[in-house]
């Protein structure tokens, strides 16, 4: 690859979900060294205050990591994946409560949260449900105008970000497949949970060097993004995180990445 390729010097954040319970703790710890931002579970779909506190401490130990909230519908039984229905008022309240809980624990470590990432079914709804996306964005804005909303490439999310005047950072997914419109397909446990290194490497190269994703028909489409999600709950997750980190010359936390409007114009 020619060293003058503009995408090699792009500013890219690498984000990781942590604090998702004892079963994932060791894997999360191994991947932390490759991340620049972490999204910490706030207790709605998994975790409890003590686990959240340990996750914050672990992130602080690594130094330089941006701290974010991993928000979800209140769904401990379904790990945030069930199709929960809340009124706009209920959704607003749970988002603000989750942000407040993480902000309070982070403050005890002399840290501030800088971004918010939806999880599970809430993440999927941010793709096409304008009402849900708007409610989440407004709740974030109420809490702090400075927080960055991290989510899937979506015209709905882009419009909501502009309307509510909060910064939206689109993320790319190595662990998921894409549709022709640039949106991610829902997670398929049989296929996506067993992502092999060869496929992951090809997807990472397309993202980092070409800012593109390959569809199932082998066609490439452009995908403008600011952050790449490092999955922690699939096979080969540590190896995948390592190879992605090796391709990005100088990853930077979202809060330090220069915001440029063209990154919000996709397809």
Regions flagged by a language model, labelled:
Residues 76-115:
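Glycine/small-residue-rich loop that forms an oxyanion/phosphate-binding "nest" at active or ligand-binding sites
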Residues 108-114, 212-224, 254-262:
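Flexible, glycine/charged-enriched surface loops at secondary-structure junctions
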Residues 154-213, 219-221:
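Active-site rim beta-loop-alpha module in soluble metabolic enzymes
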Residues 37-45, 77-92, 126, 183-195:
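Glycine-rich tight-turn/loop motif centered on a GG-T
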Residues 29-33, 54-68, 106-110:
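Acidic (Asp/Glu)-rich catalytic clusters
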Residues 40-45, 125, 143-153:
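Catalytic beta/alpha-barrel core
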Residues 12-18, 38-40, 67-71, 114-118, ...:
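Hydrophobic faces of well-ordered beta-strands that scaffold small-molecule active sites
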Residues 147, 241-267:
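C-terminal domain-boundary segment and adjacent tail
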């Amino acid at each position: 690859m020619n060293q003058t390729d503009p995408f090699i010097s792009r500013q890219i954040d690498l984000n990781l979900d942590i604090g998702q319970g004892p079963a994932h703790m060791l894997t999360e710890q191994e991947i932390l060294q490759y991340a620049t931002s972490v999204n910490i579970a706030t207790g709605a779909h998994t975790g409890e205050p003590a686990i959240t506190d340990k996750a914050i401490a672990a992130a602080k130990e690594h130094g330089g990591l941006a701290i974010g909230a991993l928000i979800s519908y209140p769904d401990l039984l379904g790990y945030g994946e069930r199709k929960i229905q809340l009124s706009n008022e209920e959704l607003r309240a749970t988002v603000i409560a989750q942000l407040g809980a993480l902000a309070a624990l982070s403050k005890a470590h002399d840290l501030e949260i800088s971004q918010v990432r939806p999880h599970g079914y809430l993440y999927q709804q941010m793709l096409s449900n304008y009402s849900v996306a708007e409610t989440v964005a407004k709740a974030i804005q109420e809490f702090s105008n400075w927080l960055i909303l991290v989510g899937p490439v979506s015209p709905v999310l882009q419009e909501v970000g502009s309307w509510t005047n909060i910064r939206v950072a689109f993320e790319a997914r190595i662990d998921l497949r894409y549709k022709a419109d640039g949106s991610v397909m829902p997670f398929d446990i049989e296929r996506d949970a067993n992502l092999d290194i060869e496929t992951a490497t090809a997807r990472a190269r397309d993202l980092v060097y070409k800012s593109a994703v390959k569809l199932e028909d082998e066609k490439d489409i452009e995908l403008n993004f600011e952050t790449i999600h490092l999955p922690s709950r699939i096979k080969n997750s540590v190896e995948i995180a390592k190879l992605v980190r090796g391709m990005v010359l100088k990853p930077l936390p979202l809060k330090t990445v220069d915001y440029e409007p063209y990154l919000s114009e996709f397809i």
